[in-house]
Amino acid sequence: ADGAVLAERMIASEVDDLIAYLQDFGEEISIVGLEAGTLAQWLTYGLRDAGYHTVVMEARHVKSALGAMRNKTDRNDARGIAQILRTGWYREVYVKSLESHYTRTLLASRKALLSKCINLENEVRGLLKVFGIKLRAGLGHGPFDEAAREPILQNEALAYALMPLLEVRLQLYQAYLELDRRVKRLANNDAVCLLLMTTPGVGAITALTFRAAVDDPRRFR
C-alpha cells in the first residue's frame, strides 16, 4: 500500500510462467496490471481464469504517465506501471471475449485472401497489357480465371510465365470462397446478426463485423 517494491523479476510473456511466479510470491495480490499490447488480452484471459483480478491499461495513458521519468529503462517502466496501478491513475481497456476475437480472425482471414486475389488479378492484367491483351473492365473474381486463361494458353511463352500465377490466384480464390461461406454461416446462426441483417443494406459481413466490434453492448452503459 505504501508503494514499496517487494520483488522484481524478468519473466517470459507466458500465462503459465506468470501464474507460477504469482503463486510463489508469498503475498496477497489484490490486482495485476498489464499495459495494452498484442499479448495483453491473451495473458489477461489466463490470469483471470486463475483467479487474479487483472486489468489492461490504455497504452497511450501509460506512456504519458511514464513520459516524465528521466531514466527510461525496462525496470523503471515496470516500477512506473506498478505505481500507476497502485494509485489508480489509469484508463482500463475493455478486454473482448475470445469469441469476438475468433470472429475477427475469421473476418480478417477472409479479407486478406480477397486482397491477395485482387492484387494478383491486377498483376495479371498489367502483364497481359504489354502484349496487347486487355481483359474487360468490371470482370468479377469468379469469371476472371476463364477470361485470363484463354489468351494466356494461346501463347506458349505467356503460358510458361503466367500460368503458375493464375493457378495460385485460383487456389486463393477458392480458399476465399470457403471462408466467405463460413462467415455467412456464422452470421446466419447468430440471433444478433440476423436482427442486424433485417436492416436494408446490411449483409452478413457488416453484421458480423459490427457484432465482433461491439462484443458486449452492456459495457457501454
Regions picked out by a protein language model, each given a short descriptive name:
Residues A1, P217-R221:
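Short, intrinsically disordered, charge-balanced linker/junction segments flanking boundaries
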Residues T199:
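Histidine-centered phosphotransfer motif of kinases
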Residues L107-L195:
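Glycine-rich, often acidic, oxyanion-interacting loops/wings at catalytic, nucleic-acid
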Residues V5, R48-T54, R70-R75, L128, ...:
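A short alpha->loop->secondary-structure connector
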Residues V55-A108, A147-P151:
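Short alpha-helix plus adjacent loop in nuclease-associated cores
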Residues A1-V55, S64:
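Glycine/alanine-rich phosphate-binding loops at beta-alpha junctions
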Residues L208-R218:
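Catalytic palm subdomain of template-directed nucleic-acid polymerases
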